[in-house]
Amino acid sequence: FANQGIGQIFGGEFLLRKALTKKFFGWVSYTLMRSLVQEKPGEAYKPFAFDQPHILTVIAVYKLPRGWQVGGRFRLVSGNPTTLYKDGVFNNEDGGYLNARGTQGRLPAFHQLDLRVDKTFTYKRMLVNVYLDVINVYNHQNPEAIVYSYNLQQNTVQAGLPIIPSLGTRLEF
């Protein structure tokens, strides 16, 4: 293993936050960025493993009576770069593929909707927030990686997280 690569990261973010009424607010965030790597001197730059040029996040929160509020977050993100392999055999000695022809590709875009309901109240001079989060509400099977067979003739897509509900409490004193 030789750590001889050079990397470049550049980009920008736009954020708009707005309270539409006293009870309803939200924001929209858009990030445009690139993350490139040159693995060896003289080679062309290529997307780094976690290069995600486009990230869109939309958040909305509605305040209900008696300390309740509901909110949601939607994210749409460019898929991560991946190498699409064709033909070859896995070499156990170095963990690589022999005679593999790889081309640069990108996984499909990631999108997810998360919802949250929470209640805030005061208890003995302490601010208590109890919440229910549901991550990936519509259970989209976001592709995280491509897993290949030993000879690269077959592959499967490894999906990300399913629906995950969670309960929590935050205390401020």
Residue ranges and their predicted role:
Residues 1, 39-44, 95-103, 149-154:
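Extracytoplasmic loops and strand-loop junctions of Gram-negative outer membrane beta-barrel proteins
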Residues 25, 34-39, 94-100, 133-135:
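Generic detector of short, locally flexible boundary/turn motifs and exposed helical patches
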